[in-house]
Each structure stands twice: as C-alpha cells, then as structure tokens.
C-alpha cells in the first residue's frame, strides 16, 4: 500500500514523463508547486518506489521513468477524467449529425479525426454486416440500362452499388420489386437475405413482375454484399513522431504490424465491452511491447457492433485518450439508434 506522499510523487513523475518524454529527477519534482517535500525526502520516496517496481532507472540519465507496473497502477488508481476542449467536442459531434447515419463512412472519418486529435494511430473496426438487419432497399434508375441499388441496415450501414437493369424490366417492375422487398425483408438479418429471397420472395414476385426471370437475375447481383467487418486506420505513420520510436529497428516491426490489417482485426474483434487498456507486454503482439492500446466498444443494447482503439507509446496521454473514446463511442451508439 502506497502512502499519500508516494502516490503524489508517483503521479507527478508519470504526468511529467508523459508530457516531456524525459526522465524525471528529484530536482525536477522539487520545483513542482504540488510537491512541498525536501529533495532528500523526494529521493528517499523515489528509491522506495523504484524498489517496489513502479519506476525504473534509465541507462542514459539519473532520472527515473515509469515502469509498466507504474503505468498500470496509474491507470487503475490515479487517473482523473479530462475535460475536452469545446471545439473538439463540437468537431466530434458534427460527425454524427447527418440525417442518414452511414456507419462505415463515420467509422472511416472517426479514425482520421482521432489520429489528428491524439497524434497516435487510430483504428476503428466497423459493424459486422452479417449481424445487421435490413431496414430498407431503394433502387434508383440512372438511365434505361443502369440503376443504383441502396441497401440500408438497422445500424446505419449504407451499401450502394450500380446494377444493370435488363431491357425487359421496366420502371413499373422496379417499383413493384422494391415495395415487395421492403414489405417482406425489413428486419431480416443480412446473412439470411439471399436464402429468403430465393426461397420465399421469388414466389411472390412471380405474381407481380412481368419479366420475372430477368428481375430475379438482377436481384441476385444486388444482394451480393460483403458481410465481414471493415477496419479503418488513421495516422498509421504517427508513431514515427514519438521519441520512443526513433530507433528504426524498433519501429520497423511495429509499422509492419500496422500495415498487416488482418492482425489488428483479430486483436479488436474480441474486445470486451467498455474501455480496455493494454500496456506494454500486456499486449499479445511482440511488436506492441513498447505500446499501449486503449479500446472501446460501441453497441446497441447488449449487441456489440464494433470497436474504436488508439495505439500509442506506453507514455500515452491516457486520460485524454479515454475521454475521447468515451465521447466517440457514446456518439456512435446514439447515432446507431436513430
């Protein structure tokens, strides 16, 4: 159990190191307004904190830096919520004011904005389409031969594709098809659409659409959509600006991993609900042993739909990043409920 004095000194060391990236010595601490102890007392407490494994000495300086154990204690017990500037709150909320909530577009933009606000790497795992339910279908003619099919799900995912309209299918047929599809398929999981169309809907269409065979062929292409999650990155190269990663050998394996999107897909798809913080070697990947990964899930009710994560050095601005992720996931969840 740490004393109040040790808690204050540990928190001040970590806060200072997060901001400066420089080892912290007793002289630096003695100049802090919140530290009212003598240099000798500070040195003694730092020695005890080092012996307990919360801070450690570097080879190049007489100062101390937080250890992984120190960061973990800091995150679990010392972290205070950070109020975000109003302009950042407005910037984030503006993402989610669109009348039609396009989850994939928002996910992509979220990754970019988060990377800019933090100067770290942002990763967003979009909703898994197979668990979405169809909300509605639109088929908008462009000319006599082509149209745009727009599929909207209950989570706000919008999938559009250009389709070829057979000459034998007229506008009246298109309108009847869309009405039948929306009446019969609204609320059906995307993973079941194809089977339901060809086991049930075709029978209904036969009684309403003149050129039945051509219409069915067109429908087959319309509902061939990818069902797996998409992963979006923002600021892939941001880690290069962090002093911890100026060593080219250290950063090469990390950048290789970031470029291998499938590896991050596996890391993020099984995240637990809520905010999760993995520090250093708590991460399963060796390339991330000098990094922290903070992730947050967004959901509707009890259904987890996706994950937003920030990858940075262990010397990360934990409080700020957590506040940003909480705001993003709150806005994302509210947007999906529209």
Curated annotation (Swiss-Prot):
Pfam families: HrcA (PF01628). Signal peptide: none annotated. One of its GO terms (biological process) is negative regulation of DNA-templated transcription. SUPFAM superfamilies: GAF domain-like, Winged helix' DNA-binding domain. Keywords: Repressor, Stress response, Transcription, Transcription regulation. It comes from the Bacteria. GO terms for molecular function: DNA binding. Belongs to the HrcA family. PANTHER family: HEAT-INDUCIBLE TRANSCRIPTION REPRESSOR HRCA. Negative regulator of class I heat shock genes (grpE-dnaK-dnaJ and groELS operons). Prevents heat-shock induction of these operons. This is Heat-inducible transcription repressor HrcA. The gene is hrcA.
